[in-house]
């Protein structure tokens, strides 16, 4: 890893003694394997960068952090790994001090940028889950880019001690020109401090963030289950609409739910069929005004049937009044209310029209003559029912949008979990060994140290493989670029 540096493999005298023995033809198979890992790392990270650049679906704020991580991994695979292999097969560093400092700078900067990229990615996922509405206003590409630039800026601060350590501290007395190592390679306190700040502290914070993310997603899932248990789903509304139709045909049966219809499929209920528009989305229901005139009003349909009782002022139950009735019976009176409501939620507009139909008993007569008390209770009840139904629809719309958001965050949390798991498993062995060497120089084991270093480098190879496993858009784009048929 950057903080001890690849060349720290040969920092200690005990490790240096093993270095010459490793430079032999027997290293050829190892060099081939390590070179293959380097090439695969470069190829996969270039594939990720090209996929994000070419596919518009991947142009998201969250993927900007993935791009930052891929750039850091690309530097590791294209610069750090090859020069590590080159130094492994050489008996001494013969490429000059400037190239050595360049390699050390790339090692430290790229490795630190990789850690910080995972860290800010974790913070982004954490805020998206914990504060979805508040953070949504601030989660822009500009702010994400500024955060990424800040992470890379702090990573580039490593250049100061690498190039200018001798300006602040006296140079190491044992520094040799035939070795590629930093001026602070033997400063234990500085190495421990940088390891804590650049690895242990961010890793602990990431683990804490991820625990919070896991609990938040789990809490949202439980809340959604409880909400779905108390309110009907859209499919339940459709099933209950069928029950409402049957209730309208059978006297004495009441249905508490409205009928939610698709205008292009279901016929209207309680409306004059001749007045229906040919447009599958628009209808022209018949409306009876207070003066008894017949009107036609265009509107979008959302038919709601509810059986209402006839007001006492409209019913004359006595036999004398029945005999005095001079006009024919009116078996059905339709009170229609059309309302167009629109609400935008994630670029989707919900347009609803609600129609209230009241049916009287066939044996009930209504007297239109003078002195008749006209009750408006049916109309008021219809409007109240429209408000209740609208609240239900609005609640379901929010639940649907919340469900989409929850699914996205669940997948993002899963992707972050895999990235963090690979990161910790690959780098924790090196840093444990690094801390041991810092306190016990005689404990250096050359093969083990090299193994932990390259295990950390392999993390840059694994990251591009994690993205398509956890993101369907990445998977489809990779298949499209590589011409792989599903």
Curated annotation (Swiss-Prot):
Cytoplasmic compartment residues: 51-64, 124-144, 212-415, 469-486
TM annotation in the entry: 30-50, 65-89, 98-123, 145-164, 189-211, 416-439, 446-468
Bias kind Basic and acidic residues: ranges: 241-253
Entry membrane topology: Multi-pass membrane protein
Pfam families: 7tm_1
Compositionally biased intervals (Polar residues): 347-365
Location relative to the cell: Cell membrane
Residue span of region Important for agonist binding: 107-112, 423-427
PTM description: Phosphorylation at sites in the second and third cytoplasmic loops independently contribute to agonist-induced receptor down-regulation.
Record PTM Phosphoserine, positions in chain: 230, 342, 345, 379, 381, 395, 397
Cysteines paired by S-S bonds: 100-180, 440-443
GO CC, any one term: plasma membrane
Principal location listed in the UniProt entry: membrane
Domain of life, per lineage: Eukaryota
Glycosylation sites: 5, 18
Region (Disordered): 241-295, 310-379
Phosphothreonine modified-residue sites: 140, 142
SMART domains: 7TM_GPCR_Srsx
Role of this protein: G-protein-coupled receptor for histamine, a biogenic amine that functions as an immune modulator and a neurotransmitter. Through the H1 receptor, histamine mediates the contraction of smooth muscles and increases capillary permeability due to contraction of terminal venules. Also mediates neurotransmission in the central nervous system and thereby regulates circadian rhythms, emotional and locomotor activities as well as cognitive functions.
Protein family according to the UniProt entry: Belongs to the G-protein coupled receptor 1 family.
Free-text comment on this protein's domains from its UniProt entry: Histamine activates the receptor by forming hydrogen bonds with transmembrane domains 3 and 6, squashing the ligand-binding pocket on the extracellular side and opening the cavity for G-protein engagement on the intracellular side.
Protein name: Histamine H1 receptor
Taxonomic path: Eukaryota, Metazoa, Chordata, Craniata, Vertebrata
């Amino acid at each position: 890893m950057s903080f001890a540096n690849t060349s720290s493999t040969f920092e200690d005298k005990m490790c240096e003694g093993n270095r010459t023995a490793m430079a032999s033809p027997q290293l050829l198979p190892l060099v081939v394997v390590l070179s293959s890992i380097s090439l695969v790392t470069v190829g996969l990270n270039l594939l990720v960068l090209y996929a994000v650049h070419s596919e518009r679906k991947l142009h998201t704020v969250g993927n900007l952090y993935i791009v930052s991580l891929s750039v850091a991994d690309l530097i590791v695979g294209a610069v750090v790994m090859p020069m590590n292999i080159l130094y492994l097969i050489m008996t001494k560093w013969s490429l000059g001090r400037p190239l050595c400092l360049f390699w050390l700078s790339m090692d430290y900067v790229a490795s630190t940028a990789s850690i910080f990229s995972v860290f800010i990615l974790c913070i982004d996922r954490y805020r998206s889950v914990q504060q979805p509405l508040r953070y949504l206003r601030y989660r822009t590409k500009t702010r994400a880019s500024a955060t990424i630039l800040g992470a890379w800026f702090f990573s580039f601060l490593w250049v100061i001690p690498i190039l200018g350590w001798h300006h602040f501290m006296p140079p190491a007395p044992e520094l040799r020109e035939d070795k590629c190592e930093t001026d602070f390679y033997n400063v234990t306190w500085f190495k421990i401090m940088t390891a804590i700040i650049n690895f242990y502290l961010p890793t602990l914070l990431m683990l804490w963030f991820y625990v919070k993310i896991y609990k938040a997603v789990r809490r949202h899932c439980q809340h959604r289950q409880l909400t779905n248990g108390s309110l009907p789903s859209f499919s339940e509304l459709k099933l209950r609409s069928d029950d409402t139709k049957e209730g309208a045909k059978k006297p004495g049966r009441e249905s508490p739910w409205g009928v939610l219809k698709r205008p292009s499929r279901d016929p209207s209920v309680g409306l004059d069929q001749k007045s229906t528009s040919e447009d599958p989305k628009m209808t022209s229901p018949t409306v009876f005004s207070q003066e008894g005139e017949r009107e036609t009003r265009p509107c979008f349909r959302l038919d709601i049937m509810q059986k209402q009782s006839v007001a006492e002022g409209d019913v004359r139950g006595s036999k004398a009044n029945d005999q005095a009735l001079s006009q024919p019976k009116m078996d059905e009176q339709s009170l229609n209310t059309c309302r167009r409501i629109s609400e935008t939620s994630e670029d989707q507009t919900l347009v609803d029209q609600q129609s209230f139909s009241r049916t009287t008993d066939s044996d009930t007569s209504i007297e239109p003559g003078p002195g008749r008390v006209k009750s408006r209770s049916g109309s008021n009840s219809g409007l109240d029912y429209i408000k209740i139904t609208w609240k239900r629809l609005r609640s379901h719309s929010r639940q649907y949008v919340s469900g989409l958001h929850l699914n996205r965050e669940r997948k993002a949390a899963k992707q972050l979990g895999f990235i963090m798991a690979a990161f910790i498993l690959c780098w924790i062995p090196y840093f444990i060994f690094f801390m041991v060497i810092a306190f016990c120089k005689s404990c250096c084991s050359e093969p083990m140290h090299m193994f932990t270093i390259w295990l950390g480098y392999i993390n840059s190879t694994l990251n591009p493989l994690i993205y398509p496993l956890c993101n369907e858009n990445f998977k489809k784009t990779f298949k499209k670029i590589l011409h792989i048929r599903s």
